[in-house]
Amino acid sequence: NSKSKFIPVSNSTDQAAGIYFRFYEKKSKLEIYSEFHYNDSKVNLRDLFVDSRHSRAFSLGIQKGSINNFIFSWEWTKLEQTAGRLIRDAGSWYAHNYVYDGFTNNGEVIGASIGPGSNLQTFEIKKYSKKNTNKYLFGFQILDNDNDYYYKAFDSSNDFRRYWKDFNFYTEFEKSFKNFNLNIKCIYTKSLNYQWGLIDDNSPSYYQPGIDLDNFNITLNLIYFGF
């Protein structure tokens, strides 16, 4: 039967909207940027004004340079649903009722690498040499892993102990010389309640210790320009 080769396709579509803002002042070397998106369309203008937080996500960043080639930066990305999900569930970002794969390409998320339901704050200090041949970077990140899942998984138990949070400390060094470029990056991650897990130690106390993990990673890249 030739009809069995075809899968019915719904005419329903997914809609999204967003705006981007960037301000840069050359003299002070100050940059402010932001991106604001809706994962679902509004019913009308009244819906936009009354429930403006529904299905929203945003990024906000500030970067400030100095005369000594230092750059200070902070960025905040928030994909977690707002409290309005209790009445009007928007679903997690990068997913949709009609377009199940969401904003993806070959199974990979297009956009923030932290994934649906997560939040991230990043603090960085960079230092460049006068000729831009060397770069030194120190950074710190606070990552909330998929709070949307956490609220759904543990809502019935009201278990507020299981937030999965990562703290990343990293440093990077980059040097260019002759036809070579050397890059070394070191990252230390302290993960609290990894995958929302707790250790059952048979203690009568409600506050059980979480599954806390440590990870240290070193990446070295050497690139040759000359072929």
Residue ranges and their predicted role:
Residues 1-227:
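Exposed, low-structure sequence patches enriched in small/polar residues
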